[in-house]
């Protein structure tokens, strides 16, 4: 279609009366406003071939679409492969070693392609009519050491480049050596081969790949490498655009055309949810039949002792609390290697929510020290305030009220900025998705109008330039002793809430209330329920603060706190259970 060549045609459109024409591949004029195609063709005068002769109504004839319009023949799995490659590169830029991309994620993806019968098998499911047979070689799926031999390159080259290949080579070469597609495969319903079939495919026992599943693959790879990134960190980096996720398809090579059913496959219009990605991680790990992951030991970043220290620093709590969190970890057995290590082939495959668990332990310690009943914490704050006024040269006691006031102000400011950033986020991609090539001009025109309106609106609302993407950081709050505007509580003492008894320290508070008195049945979809009105304001604030840090629902953190308490006060729960059983027996 050539708009410049159609400028000479000045007649009005019979449908919409507009004078805006373009040329089809057959040489006929069409209206760019309503897409009405006329019977008129372009008049071409060519005096070079036939002297003194005017040629009218020259039909250029049907011609094969050029490569720039049609693009490559590509499969859906190649699209997800490209997204995984983008995410792996982003993690590499964040400081993760290249082994995650070249070794771990590479092998996980190859294993998925084989187990889902899309590649690395004799007859890939999208290239022939019959179902392929996965190459077993009479070996166990869990034999990870023999996996490179098990995966023979039948229909798909390696996902990641070798040392000799550059990153640019991946985007310039055609990833899959695919034979000429049939008419049904190159349907206008999808830009990818088999896009319609993929969107309708429902096969029992097969984990269907989606864009959120790519984050599950990334987290599995990080967990295998025991990298210093938790699931909440990963999702926050996605939210801050450090890791491609929303509109990741716009970074596909130009030759990979997306339209039709590809919209539903690669288009994402919501932020990734912690619980959803967590479940998908277990689902993918189980489907791939992966062996037991490397042990999570005490020197590993994901161990609760290290994560507790990290989050204590994050929320400006005293360093002395770390001894108490370590004690809770030891008493509950949550620091044991077998408890922390992910084993997908175990009977009940599950992995620990490392970040949520660490935060829940801190909440339990705060309840042990201050009770958080909207009464005792303020009484202890009065004692700490009086002591600090009398002993200004000594190490200050931790004042819960002062900490609450400072943290609430910082939390409200941070949350407001976060909500504003979410409200201003541009969901529409720079590369619009459309259903067919007929809709392409309309889609790009709409996109152009949206961009212009956004520029005008931003000029009217805020004349200041929009801040650029902030650099990635493991911490969202920064507290230093040099900050004169905000008090740093890291070096404050817990003497006001602890008392000595022999060689040990005990809490002055001898009371404790359980977050959950009775857990839900095993067939229920949740462990416990959370209603804010049933709990103290102090407890609500603590949960809201940590939930914001991890970008999780408050109910999820409350559930984890209840599970920590169940392990810590196991005897108390068992006594309660026996009493309830005895009451039932008396009734009968």
Swiss-Prot record:
Keywords: Acetylation, DNA-binding, Metal-binding, Nucleus, Transcription, Transcription regulation, Zinc, Zinc-finger. A zinc finger (RRN7-type) spans 4-39. One of its GO terms (biological process) is RNA polymerase I preinitiation complex assembly. Residues 74-261 are annotated as: N-terminal cyclin fold. InterPro entries: Rrn7_cyclin_C, Rrn7_cyclin_N, TAF1B/Rrn7, TF_Rrn7_Zf. One of its GO terms (cellular component) is RNA polymerase I core factor complex. Zn(2+) binds at residues 13, 16, 31, 34. Its main location: nucleus. One of its GO terms (molecular function) is zinc ion binding. The modification N6-acetyllysine is found at residue 440. Residues 69-73 are annotated as: B-linker. The modification N-acetylmethionine is found at residue 1. It is found in: Nucleus, Nucleolus. Interacts with FLNA (via N-terminus). Component of the transcription factor SL1/TIF-IB complex, notably composed of TBP and at least TAF1A, TAF1B, TAF1C and TAF1D. In the complex interacts directly with TBP, TAF1A and TAF1C. Interaction of the SL1/TIF-IB subunits with TBP excludes interaction of TBP with the transcription factor IID (TFIID) subunits. Interacts with TBP and RRN3. Part of Pol I pre-initiation complex (PIC), in which Pol I core assembles with RRN3 and promoter-bound UTBF and SL1/TIF-IB complex. Component of RNA polymerase I core factor complex that acts as a GTF2B/TFIIB-like factor and plays a key role in multiple steps during transcription initiation such as pre-initiation complex (PIC) assembly and postpolymerase recruitment events in polymerase I (Pol I) transcription. Binds rDNA promoters and plays a role in Pol I recruitment as a component of the SL1/TIF-IB complex and, possibly, directly through its interaction with RRN3. This is TATA box-binding protein-associated factor RNA polymerase I subunit B.
């Amino acid at each position: 279609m050539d708009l410049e060549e159609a400028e000479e045609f000045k007649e009005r459109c019979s449908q919409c009366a507009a004078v805006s024409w373009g040329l089809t591949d057959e040489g006929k004029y069409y209206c760019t406003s309503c897409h009405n195609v006329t019977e008129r063709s372009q008049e071409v005068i060519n005096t070079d071939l036939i002297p003194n002769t005017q040629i009218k109504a020259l039909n250029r004839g049907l011609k094969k679409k050029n490569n720039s319009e049609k693009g490559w023949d590509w499969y859906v799995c190649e699209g997800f492969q490209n997204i995984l490659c983008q995410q792996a590169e982003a993690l590499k830029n964040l400081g993760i070693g290249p082994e995650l991309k070249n070794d771990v994620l590479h092998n996980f993806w190859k294993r998925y392609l084989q187990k889902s019968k899309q590649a690395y098998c004799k007859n890939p499911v999208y290239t022939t009519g019959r179902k392929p047979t996965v190459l077993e070689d009479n070996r166990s799926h869990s034999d990870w050491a023999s996996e490179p031999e098990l995966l023979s390159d039948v229909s798909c080259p390696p996902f990641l480049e070798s040392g000799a290949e550059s990153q640019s080579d991946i985007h310039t070469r055609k990833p899959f050596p695919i034979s000429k597609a049939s008419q049904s495969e190159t349907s206008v319903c999808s830009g990818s081969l088999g896009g319609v079939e993929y969107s309708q495919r429902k096969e029992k026992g097969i984990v269907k790949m989606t864009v959120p599943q790519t984050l599950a693959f990334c987290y599995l790879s990080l967990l295998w490498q025991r990298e210093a990134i938790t699931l909440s960190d990963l999702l926050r980096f996605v939210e801050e655009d450090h890791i491609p996720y929303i509109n990741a398809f716009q970074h596909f090579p130009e030759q990979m055309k997306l339209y039709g059913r590809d919209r539903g496959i690669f288009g994402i219009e919501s932020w990734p949810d912690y619980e959803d990605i967590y479940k998908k991680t277990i689902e993918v790990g189980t489907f791939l039949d992966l062996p037991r992951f490397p042990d999570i030991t005490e020197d590993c970043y994901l161990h609760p002792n290290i994560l507790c220290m990290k989050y204590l620093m994050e929320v400006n709590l005293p360093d002395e609390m770390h001894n108490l969190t370590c004690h809770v970890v030891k008493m509950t057995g949550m620091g044991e290697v077998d408890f922390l290590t992910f084993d997908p082939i175990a009977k009940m495959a599950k992995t620990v929510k490392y970040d949520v668990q660490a935060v829940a332990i801190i909440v339990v310690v705060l309840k042990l020290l201050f009770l958080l009943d909207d009464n005792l914490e303020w009484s202890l704050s009065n004692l700490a305030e009086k002591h600090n006024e009398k002993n200004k040269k000594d190490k200050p006691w931790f004042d819960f009220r002062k900490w609450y006031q400072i943290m609430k102000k910082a939390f409200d400011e941070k949350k407001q900025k976060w909500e504003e950033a979410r409200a201003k986020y541009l969901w529409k991609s720079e590369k619009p998705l459309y259903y067919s090539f007929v809709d392409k001009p309309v889609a790009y025109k709409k996109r152009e109008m949206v961009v212009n309106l956004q520029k005008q609106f931003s000029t009217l609302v805020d004349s200041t330039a929009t801040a650029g993407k902030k650099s990635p950081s493991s911490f969202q709050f920064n507290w230093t002793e040099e900050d004169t505007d905000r008090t740093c509580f890291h070096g404050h003492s817990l003497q006001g809430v602890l008392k000595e008894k022999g060689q040990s320290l005990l809490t002055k508070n001898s009371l404790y209330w359980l977050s959950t008195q009775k857990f839900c049945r095993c067939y229920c979809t949740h462990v416990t329920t959370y209603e804010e009105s049933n709990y103290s304001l102090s407890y609500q604030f603590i949960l809201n603060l940590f939930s914001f840090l991890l970008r999780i629902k408050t109910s999820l953190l409350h559930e984890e706190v209840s599970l920590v308490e169940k392990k810590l006060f196991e005897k108390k729960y068992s006594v309660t259970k026996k009493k309830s059983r005895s009451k039932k027996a008396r009734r009968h």
